[in-house]
Amino acid sequence: MVSETTKSSPLHFVLFPFMAQGHMIPMVDIARLLAQRGVIITIVTTPHNAARFKNVLNRAIESGLPINLVQVKFPYLEAGLQEGQENIDSLDTMERMIPFFKAVNFLEEPVQKLIEEMNPRPSCLISDFCLPYTSKIAKKFNIPKILFHGMGCFCLLCMHVLRKNREILDNLKSDKELFTVPDFPDRVEFTRTQVPVETYVPAGDWKDIFDGMVEANETSYGVIVNSFQELEPAYAKDYKEVRSGKAWTIGPVSLCNKVGADKAERGNKSDIDQDECLKWLDSKKHGSVLYVCLGSICNLPLSQLKELGLGLEESQRPFIWVIRGWEKYKELVEWFSESGFEDRIQDRGLLIKGWSPQMLILSHPSVGGFLTHCGWNSTLEGITAGLPLLTWPLFADQFCNEKLVVEVLKAGVRSGVEQPMKWGEEEKIGVLVDKEGVKKAVEELMGESDDAKERRRRAKELGDSAHKAVEEGGSSHSNISFLLQDIMELAEPNN
């Protein structure tokens, strides 16, 4: 480990991950990357969330990395939540989302006391975009705050442009009308419902929550982005200009996981034995397996999940299908059994009911494609593994990420989903892609057409670039150095 901070006054970064699996995983990776450079790291979270990362962090600490995990009690009672509801994926209904965000902001007072007592004094706060209360703490103690969105530069720039041109969204005649994003490096079209909700949200509690996030974004010192310059060069350049030079692409941060245990155990413990999974993959032909995972907060209705399953079956290709939140899909379990689906696909399909060792699976040579919900972590992990993607966006930034992968990078195939899944309206929305559509998209991705071969070549090229970016001398490795230098200069007494 090469320290990039002085021994007399080491930098001390305090990290605040948002309590959602897709936000916490990269923040823990960022903690390890910074600690490898000699930065003292304190991660602030709640007991239930700390337990998810205990093993990964213990291994990091035992290896000599200066990481400390501090826990604060989550005020679930004060917000009207149930005990244990400390993470987005633990909420049983959409109605609990607003109380959850209120509970998060109740953490300001206990966290402020923590910061007051910290020794050494924090040099910098790195906070998730969804925790605007940290801006007040940064201002009170005059500590620079770096923001982490968990999105790529393409989406961040898109959100910035649309906030500045709000009238474009206001003037649309319907939610299905297409518009072109102005002042963008590439010509990209969306409908109003496909853009991230932070960009366009009606009045009410949600607007108040997002307005607080936007204000915190605009008052932060800078932004770190889990991406790399070679992936989206024009967007990284333009977004850095928007942030007055204070935007650093430091990814893919997942590549800090170099040993099998860390790859297999990111966040929740896997619900399949690692050796069993690898043995199954070893039995398949090189590049033949489609990995299917629609994220930690998949809200597809039963009717759509059935069509997805039947389409995978009819594709006649080997697949791994991860279904998270399995306990919520009892009817699907019954259908698997009663319809004979599980019996019919047992030699060709592997069902993982819960969490999977995603990085291990994606990096296995038998895997040749990834059907993803286009959450940024999964999108980037697929790209890093050099795999072409079959895109199935659900909500939030996911339609943005689909546009980047399919239209800009030319490394993916669309499933055909045109509208987001609204929480509470899933059954009303129903089936967006039938089994024939699924089968056709799988064939387009995994087949032997010239276009499919070109996508695979392009995906491998991007994967190689991702690995080079984090090596010494690579763009992301260098950007971490630039970030640390910037904060060191701020920490000097005369500054």
Swiss-Prot record:
Q: What UniProt keywords are attached to this protein's entry?
A: Glycosyltransferase, Membrane, Transferase, Transmembrane, Transmembrane helix
| InterPro entries recorded | UDP_glucos_trans (IPR002213), UDP_glycos_trans_CS (IPR035595)
Question: Where, by residue number, does UDP-alpha-D-glucose bind?
Answer: 296, 356-358, 373-381, 395-398
**Segment Disordered: which positions?**
446-477
**Would the keyword Transmembrane helix be found if you checked this record's keyword annotation?**
yes
Sections of the chain in a coiled coil: none
Task: Identify one Gene Ontology CC term for this UniProt entry.
Answer: endoplasmic reticulum
Q: Which organism is it from?
A: Arabidopsis thaliana
Question: What protein is this chain from?
Answer: UDP-glycosyltransferase 73C5
* Pfam families with a match to the protein in the record: UDPGT
Query: Taxonomic lineage per UniProt?
Result: Eukaryota, Viridiplantae, Streptophyta, Embryophyta, Tracheophyta
Q: Which domain of life is it from?
A: Eukaryota
